[in-house]
Amino acid sequence: MNKSEAEAKIRALRREINEHNYNYYNLAKPKISDYDFDALLRTLAELEAKYPDLVTPDSPSQRVGGEVTKNFPIVRHKTRMLSLSNTYNLGELGDFLARVAKSLESEGVQAYDFTAELKYDGVAVSLIYRDGLLVQGATRGDGSQGDEITANLKTVRTIPLRLRAPASGSAFDTEKWNGSGDIEVRGEVFMTKADFEKINAERDESEQFANPRNATAGTLKQQDSREVAKRRLTMVAYYLDGRPFADLSHGERLEKLAELGFYTGEAHRTCRSLQDIQAFLDEWENKRDALAYEIDGAVIKLNNVRYQELLGATSKSPRWAIAYKYAARRAETVLENVVFQVGRTGAITPVAELQPVKLSGSVISRSTLHNLDEIRRLDLHIGDRVIIEKSGDVIPKVVGVVAEKRPPEARTIEPLSTCPSCGTPLEHPENEVIYYCPNEFGCPAQRKARLVHFASRHAMDIEGLGEAVVEQLLGAGLIGDPGDLYFIEKTALLALERFAEKSAQNLLNGIEASKSRSFERLIFALGIRYVGRRTASILADRFTSLDTIKSASQAELCETEEIGETIAKSVALFFTKPQVQELLGKLERAGLRLASDKKSPDAPQTFAGMTVVFTGSLENFTRDDAAAKVGERGGKVTSTVSKKTSLVVAGKEAGGKLAKAEKLGVKIVTEAEFQTMLAAESGD
C-alpha cells in the first residue's frame, strides 16, 4: 500500500469509526461488535503510525489521551455560564411561569412555549469549534472563566472532535462558519452509575468518590488525559450558539446539536402549560431509578431565544429558565455519636456520626447538626433511629427522630462548655445560636481551619493544599498562618513524608499561582467573621486596598451598601489585631494583590446616573469587565432594554436588544465608540 492509498484508507476508516461511535454513544444502537470496532481502531492506529504526517487533530485515534498537563490555563467564557435558580415545588414553578408571562406580555408577546429537559447531575463545560474542529474545551469555573481542559474533553466519546456534516437541505449556513463565527456548545459531563461503581471498586476505601458527580469533577481535573480516557465519561449537550443558528429556537438548536453529532439526552419536550410540564416531571421521576445515570430534576426553558434575550438575567441566573428538583430522598439509620468541630472563626458545630447508610448513590456516615438549638429542637439522643435527607449535592442532614424506636440505653447529648481543641471556655454572643471559642490565634483547630479556608477553591484556590497537607505542614512547624505558605522552601517539603520532587514542586506551583488571585478573593480568604464571598466583593468594590479597609472607621464601613453594624464591627476589629498586621506584612512581602485592579471611587463619572445595556459579542472586554468599567464610573448595567435605558453598547452579532433599542430611540454606540468614551475621560 503506497502513501496515497494509505491516505484514502485512513479517511475511510475515520468516517466508519466516527459513524460507529455516533451509533453506539449517541443513539445506543451499535451496528458492530466491540471486537470489530477495536479492530478498526487498531488498523487506523497502525496506518497512522506508519504515516505520522497523516495524523489529524480530529482523528478517532486522538481520543486516547496524550501528554501530562502540569497546569490548566485559565480561559474566559464568551458569555457568562450562569447557574440556574431552582425550586422543589409546583407552586413556585407556577410563579416562575407567571413572571415570564407578565414580562413577555409587557413586551407585547402573547404566544410562546417552553422546553423541558432532564437535569443531569454532572459538571458543566464549554466547547469552542472553529471551522467545525474542536479547538477549546473549558470548565464552568466561576462562570466568567474556567480551566482549559481540551485534552481531557477530547477523550469523551459523545463530544465530536469534528462536527458532523449538516443533513441535506439543512438551514445550517457553512458560508458563515469561519474564524470570526466560532460555534460554542455547552453541556453537562457525567458518569454512569455502573462506571462510578467500577471506579470506586478499584480504589481504596479512604479514596472512594462520594457520588458520580464528584467522580466526574475529579476525573476532569486529572492532569494525564490518558487516565481520563479510561473513565468513560459522557456529555449531554444543551446549548448551541453561533451565527448560523441565530434564528433557531432552543428546541430547534437541540435538534441541530443532535444533527451535528452530539448526544442531547434521554428526553426533551415542548410544553405550553404547567400541566404539560408536570406530566413531563412525573413521567421522569418515575423512570429516574431505571436510568443509567443520575438525574436530579428537570430544566424548564423559554423556547424562543429572542424572548430569552428580552427577559435577560440577574447577576446569578437567567430569568427565562428554572431548575425543578425532585424531592430529597430519605433514609433511616442510627445516631452513633455526636462530635464537636471548631471552625475558622471559632464557631462550634456539632456533627452527627451515623451508622453508614446508602442514600442517593452515596454512603452517608456523617451529617452536620448545625448548632445545639437544632439538637434540642429535634430532641436527639445518642442511639436514636434518625431520618437523614440528601438532595442533590447538598450535605446530608438529620431531619427527624423515630421516637417510637428510641432504645432504653439512649443517652442525652451534653452541651459543651469548653473548646474541644484548646480547652478555652466558650462564649455565646447575644442573639446568636452559635457558641464560639474566643482563643482565635491560639486554638489549633482554628489555625488549621483558617489555613484550609485560605487555600479553598473560592478563596486562593491553592492546588494540592488540602486538609491533610495543611495538618502535615502545621505539624512540621513550617507554617503558622497563611502568610508562611509563600516562604516555604522545597528542601523543607522534601524532608516530609509523602513529598517527592514532583509533589513538592506541584504544591509550590499552586502557591505561586495563588498570588494572582483577585483582591476580593483575598478578602474572602482572610476568614473575617461574617464576611462571605458576597460581602468580600462589596468591600472590594467600595474600598480600593486593604490599607483603606484597615483605616476605615466602623461608621464608614456601615455606610457601605449591605454592610450592617455586626459586619462592620467584625471587620474593624479584625484589622486591629497584631497577628493580622503580621499576616498582612507577610502577604505584602510575598507579592499578593493587596489592592484592587479597579479604578478608585473618584474615577471620572462618565456614566453617572446612566443605565447601560450590552448586546452582542465584545472583542476587547468580557461582559463582566465592561460592566465593571460602567459601574466604576457611576453607571448601572442591566440585561434588558426599556424606556429607562440610557445607552446600548452593540457588539458583533447583536440581536433583539439592538432592534428594541432602535425602536425605542435609545442611544446606541459600537464597542469602538464605548472604548473612545473610556479613553476620552483620561485624555488618551
Curated annotation (Swiss-Prot):
Binding site for Zn(2+): 419, 422, 437, 443
Cofactor: Mg(2+); Mn(2+)
Residues at the active site: 119
Domain BRCT: 602-684
Domain of life, source organism: Bacteria
An annotated GO BP: DNA replication
SUPFAM superfamilies assigned to the protein according to its UniProt record, in alphabetical order: BRCT domain, DNA ligase/mRNA capping enzyme, catalytic domain, Nucleic acid-binding proteins, RuvA domain 2-like
The keyword Metal-binding appears for this protein: yes
Coiled-coil ranges per UniProt: none
Pfam families cross-referenced by the UniProt entry: BRCT (PF00533), DNA_ligase_aden (PF01653), DNA_ligase_OB (PF03120), DNA_ligase_ZBD (PF03119), HHH_2 (PF12826), HHH_5 (PF14520), Nlig-Ia (PF22745)
SMART domains linked: BRCT, HhH1, LIGANc
Residues holding NAD(+): 34-38, 83-84, 117, 140, 188, 301, 325
Annotated GO MF terms: DNA binding; DNA ligase (NAD+) activity; metal ion binding
Keywords on record: DNA damage, DNA repair, DNA replication, Ligase, Magnesium, Manganese, Metal-binding, NAD, Zinc
EC number: 6.5.1.2
The reaction(s) this protein catalyses: NAD(+) + (deoxyribonucleotide)n-3'-hydroxyl + 5'-phospho-(deoxyribonucleotide)m = (deoxyribonucleotide)n+m + AMP + beta-nicotinamide D-nucleotide
Keyword check for Chloroplast: no
GO cellular component, one term: cytosol
Function comment: DNA ligase that catalyzes the formation of phosphodiester linkages between 5'-phosphoryl and 3'-hydroxyl groups in double-stranded DNA using NAD as a coenzyme and as the energy source for the reaction. It is essential for DNA replication and repair of damaged DNA.
Family membership: Belongs to the NAD-dependent DNA ligase family. LigA subfamily.
Name of this protein: DNA ligase
Species of provenance: Chloroherpeton thalassium (strain ATCC 35110 / GB-78)
